């Protein structure tokens, strides 16, 4: 059985050749990932739907330029993030607050903290509150670095900022996160849970629970037709 990456690559190749059905199938296969990526930057469902529609229009218009079809989904994520950032800039809005998770992805790989997160509503709520209270311009860096596994260099190139700026946002974000988490967790049953893997587990949990609304899933026709 082909992997999702392989199947997406085949669909992208067919779409690049102009096959209409492939565009519809490619949209259906990637819209959940694209939707979650957009939620890393935008909070309004209306804004997300608009940004996704434009992102897919751009992706489909230039799909023939994609050198490696199997990398379509990763390429699409970059388009979505850039389009969401453009949307914020053009509409005079601010990026919803973000967070840095320090260390490396290996810090939590293989841990069972996702299970703890799933079964601990109080911990999830506390982490969500902390994440939403942090300074702006960090959430995107956090998710790209820690959940999406992008390197500092890749984040810098994607966001059009220096690597030093990325590192600075991550550093100060983590300090704030750790301070607020320590204060919020005192006296609670999850006191002592390491904040870095806990937030990483939360991001993975939320990604698994994230589902694109019907209004987003059903715009295929207008995207392809455009």
What is each of the regions a protein language model found here?
Residues 2, 6, 12-36:
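A short, charge-rich alpha-helical start-of-domain segment used by transcription regulators
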Residues 25-45, 62, 131:
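Amphipathic, Lys/Arg- and hydrophobic-enriched alpha-helical face
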Residues 30, 51, 169-172:
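Residues within the DNA-recognition helix of helix-turn-helix
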Residues 36, 50-57, 61, 70-82:
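Structural recognition of an alpha-helix C-terminal capping motif at a helix-to-coil junction
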Residues 64-68, 81-99, 172:
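Arg/Lys-rich amphipathic alpha helix in sigma70-family domain 2
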Residues 96, 100-108, 115-119, 132, ...:
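Hydrophobic topogenic segments
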Residues 121, 131-139:
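Short helix-coil-helix linker/hinge
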Residues 141-145:
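A short pre-motif secondary-structure segment
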């Amino acid at each position: 059985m082909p992997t999702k990456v392989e199947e997406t690559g085949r669909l992208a190749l067919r779409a690049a050749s102009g096959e209409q059905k492939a565009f519809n199938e490619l949209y259906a296969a990637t819209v959940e990932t694209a939707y979650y990526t957009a939620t890393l930057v935008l909070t309004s469902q209306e804004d997300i739907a608009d940004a996704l529609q434009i992102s897919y229009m751009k992706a489909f218009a230039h799909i023939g330029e994609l050198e490696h079809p199997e990398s379509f989904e990763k390429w699409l994520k970059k388009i979505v993030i850039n389009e969401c950032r453009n949307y914020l800039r053009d509409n005079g809005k601010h990026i919803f607050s973000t967070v840095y998770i320090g260390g490396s992805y290996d810090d939590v790989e293989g841990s069972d903290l996702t299970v703890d997160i799933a079964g601990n509503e109080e911990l999830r709520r506390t982490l969500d509150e902390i994440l939403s209270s942090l300074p702006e311009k960090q959430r995107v860096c956090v998710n790209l670095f820690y959940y999406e596994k992008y390197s500092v260099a890749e984040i810098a190139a994607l966001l059009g900022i220096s690597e030093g700026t990325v590192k600075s946002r991550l550093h100060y974000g983590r300090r704030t996160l750790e301070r607020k988490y320590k204060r919020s967790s005192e006296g609670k049953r999850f006191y002592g849970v390491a904040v870095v893997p806990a937030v990483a587990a939360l991001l993975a949990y939320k990604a698994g629970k994230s589902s694109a609304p019907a209004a987003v899933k059903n715009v295929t026709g207008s995207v392809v037709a455009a």
